[in-house]
């Protein structure tokens, strides 16, 4: 009985391998560079001043880059 089950499992894996399953292209794991860029962007920091193009002087201590001093 176990050998028949093993043969059936082997045939199923040969006919439909697990790598043939299509992956969702919208997964963030598929694009790690974009995900990292979005996470560390200083423009998205709440202390970033878009008009001046830099962070407020006190936010340098809060790891907001670039600082204008």
Swiss-Prot record:
One of the record's GO molecular function terms: ion channel inhibitor activity
Phylogenetic placement of the source organism: Eukaryota, Metazoa, Spiralia, Lophotrochozoa, Mollusca
Comment block on domains: The cysteine framework is III (CC-C-C-CC). Classified in the M-2 branch, since 2 residues stand between the fourth and the fifth cysteine residues.
Protein family: Belongs to the conotoxin M family.
InterPro entries associated with the record: Conotoxin
Positions of the propeptide segment: 21-52
Gene Ontology cellular component terms for the protein in this record: extracellular region
Protein name per the record: Mu-conotoxin-like Am3.3
Position of the signal peptide: 1-20
Function field: Mu-conotoxins block voltage-gated sodium channels (Nav).
Highest taxon listed in the record's lineage: Eukaryota
In-chain residues carrying the UniProt-annotated modification Cysteine amide: 68
UniProt key word Signal: yes
UniProt note on tissues of expression: Expressed by the venom duct.
UniProt PTM comment: Is not hydroxylated. Contains 3 disulfide bonds.
UniProt subcellular location: Secreted
UniProt keywords, alphabetically: Amidation, Disulfide bond, Ion channel impairing toxin, Neurotoxin, Secreted, Signal, Toxin, Voltage-gated sodium channel impairing toxin
């Amino acid at each position: 009985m176990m050998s028949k089950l093993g043969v059936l499992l082997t045939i199923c894996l040969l006919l439909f391998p697990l790598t043939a399953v299509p992956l969702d292209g919208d997964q963030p794991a598929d694009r790690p560079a974009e995900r990292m860029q979005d996470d560390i962007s200083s423009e998205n920091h709440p202390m970033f001043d878009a008009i001046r193009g830099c962070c407020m002087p006190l936010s340098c201590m809060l790891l907001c880059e670039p600082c204008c001093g």
